[in-house]
From Swiss-Prot:
GO cellular component terms attached to this protein's record: cytosol
Keyword vocabulary terms for this entry: ATP-binding, Cytoplasm, Glycolysis, Kinase, Nucleotide-binding, Transferase
Coiled-coil regions listed: none
PROSITE patterns, sorted: PGLYCERATE_KINASE
Pfam families found in the cross-reference section: PGK
Signal peptide segment: none
Recorded catalytic activity of this chain's protein: (2R)-3-phosphoglycerate + ATP = (2R)-3-phospho-glyceroyl phosphate + ADP
UniProt keyword annotation of Cytoplasm present: yes
Pathway: Carbohydrate degradation; glycolysis; pyruvate from D-glyceraldehyde 3-phosphate: step 2/5
The enzyme's E.C. designation: 2.7.2.3
Sites where the protein binds ATP: 197, 314, 340-343
Protein name, as recorded: Phosphoglycerate kinase
Length: 387
């Protein structure tokens, strides 16, 4: 994968537009989870150190396109960046016809989704973005799977289009995990539905030695193997699909589980052998016996890809399975890569971030890359590099 990299460019005195993924949760006008902003800071700082006039853009939430919405404003992000960088980061609302920014200074553009044509990747809008800069830097891996004005269109029309350090690191880490993984390889794929992760499961079944499933996905595999899952979430129409995947790769199934009679923070957790699951039970986590077995599989792996917690870890009584696996990944000598929104929240909760080789900031983009799909924004950077 050959792309031009921002780190190789002379940015002194250049107007540089950086597309970051600053789509962070905001609560009461304040950033409530800063992981994506923290991930973007090294790129922004590097551009400033290189003497560029820096313009940063991002989306936030899903506003009605072309309309301002206070709840989707990047104002709290501008305030956060000002504190983090120790300098004023003005939020610029009207920028499409030009913006005044000096070398060594930085501005943040208001939410790109307030611009008509952003999501449809309109040429006219993309050309306006491109006219603002000498160099466009795509650094938002989390939106690289979307062909939009500020991710794909601008890369097509900018004088120079390059990958930022964060995007380049994501591509390198994923390439290492999927292209030539150290053996044996284990993957954890968890979520509510097999249907939403079917392509991921099929793709990983071709390269994994152990495919550990969790959540509603595991319930479907358990039901496919003839086990009772009570009133747990599962997909009865995908039992044959689960069996077909299990025929291609080792899918170790839980031997014990944590169940409850209701899905609630106050629910009482009970550990049961899988054979003892009652008709009115909901499976909300893997049991300690299963967690210990899965942990051993992970500790002996050469590569680990982790997407999704294996239980309802938001409720502590159903979080022990995810906690045990998180600690096992942290203690493993394997090259480990983790991605997907809930996965990042679990990593935060159990304090293992520093012991995971690479944490992907992309949710949908991470999954599409794992599926083997082409990411439009990356493909455009490759085309520009070839040209």
């Amino acid at each position: 994968m050959t792309v031009l990299k921002m780190t190789d460019l002379d940015l002194q005195g250049k107007r540089v537009l950086i597309r970051e993924d600053l789509n962070v949760p905001i609560k009461d006008g304040v950033v409530s989870s800063d992981a994506r902003i923290l991930a973007s800071l090294p790129t922004i700082r590097l551009a400033l150190e290189k003497g560029a006039a820096v313009m940063v853009c991002s989306h936030l939430g899903r506003p009605t396109e072309g309309e301002f919405s206070a709840e989707n404003s990047l104002k709290p992000v501008a305030e956060y960046l000002s504190k983090a960088l120790g300098r004023d980061v003005p939020l610029v609302a009207d920028y499409l016809d030009g913006v005044d920014v000096k070398a060594g200074d930085i501005v943040l553009f208001e939410n790109v989704r307030f611009n008509k044509g952003e999501k449809k990747n309109a040429d006219e809008l993309a050309q306006k973005y491109a006219a603002l800069c000498d160099v466009f830097v795509m650094d938002a891996f989390g939106t690289a799977h979307r062909a939009e004005g500020s991710t794909h269109g601008v890369a097509k029309y900018a004088k120079v289009a390059a990958a930022g350090p964060l995007l380049a690191a994501e591509l390198e880490a994923l390439g290492k995990a999927l292209g030539a993984p150290a053996q044996p390889m284990a993957a954890i794929v968890a979520g509510s539905k097999v249907s939403t992760k079917l392509d991921v499961l099929n793709s990983l079944s071709a390269i994994c030695d152990q495919l550990i499933v969790g959540g509603g996905i595991a319930n479907t595999f358990l039901a496919a193997a003839g086990h009772k899952v009570g009133k747990s979430l599962y997909e009865p129409d995908l039992l044959d699909t689960a069996r077909a995947i299990a025929a291609k790769v080792s899918v170790p199934l839980p031997t014990d589980v944590v169940v409850a009679k209701e899905f609630a923070e106050s629910a009482t957790a009970t550990v049961k052998l899988i054979a003892d699951v009652a008709d009115d039970d909901m499976i909300l986590d893997i049991g300690p016996q299963t967690a210990a077995h899965f942990a051993e599989l992970l500790k002996s792996s050469g590569t680990i890809l982790w997407n999704g917690p294996v239980g309802v870890f938001e409720f502590d009584q159903f979080g022990e399975g995810t906690k045990t696996l998180a600690k096992a990944i942290a203690e493993s000598k394997a090259f480990s890569i983790a991605g997907g929104g809930d996965t990042l929240a679990a990593i935060d909760k159990y304090g293992v971030a520093d012991q995971i080789s690479y944490i992907s900031t992309g949710g949908g983009a991470f999954l599409e890359f794992v599926e083997g799909k082409v990411l439009p924004a990356v493909e455009m950077l490759e085309q520009r590099a070839r040209a």
